[in-house]
């Protein structure tokens, strides 16, 4: 769980565009972020197992 200061820092407008980075909308994690869902890998996995993300299911072959 990121500190509140890090989340506030990320939300501020950056002077340079390259300094901007994505955070998980659910937990605030900055690493392993999936743009398509706006979530980190951990939250994506949890929600997918609960069936809360339409069209996502566990692979089986």
Curated annotation (Swiss-Prot):
NCBIfam families: PRK08061.1. Its cofactor is Zn(2+). SUPFAM superfamilies: Glucocorticoid receptor-like (DNA-binding domain) (SSF57716). Binds 1 zinc ion per subunit. Keywords: Metal-binding, Ribonucleoprotein, Ribosomal protein, RNA-binding, rRNA-binding, Zinc. HAMAP family: Ribosomal_uS14_2_B. Part of the 30S ribosomal subunit. Contacts proteins S3 and S10. Binds 16S rRNA, required for the assembly of 30S particles and may also be responsible for determining the conformation of the 16S rRNA at the A site. One of its GO terms (molecular function) is structural constituent of ribosome. Belongs to the universal ribosomal protein uS14 family. Zinc-binding uS14 subfamily. GO terms for biological process: translation. Pfam families: Ribosomal_S14. This is Small ribosomal subunit protein uS14. The keyword Isomerase does not apply. Zn(2+) binds at residues 24, 27, 40, 43. It comes from the Bacteria. GO terms for cellular component: cytoplasm; small ribosomal subunit.
């Amino acid at each position: 769980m990121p500190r509140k200061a890090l989340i506030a820092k990320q939300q501020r407008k950056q002077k340079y565009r390259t300094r901007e980075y994505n955070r998980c909308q659910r937990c605030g994690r900055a690493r392993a972020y999936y743009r398509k869902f706006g979530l980190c890998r951990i939250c994506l996995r949890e929600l997918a197992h609960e069936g809360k993300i339409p069209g996502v299911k566990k692979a089986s072959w």
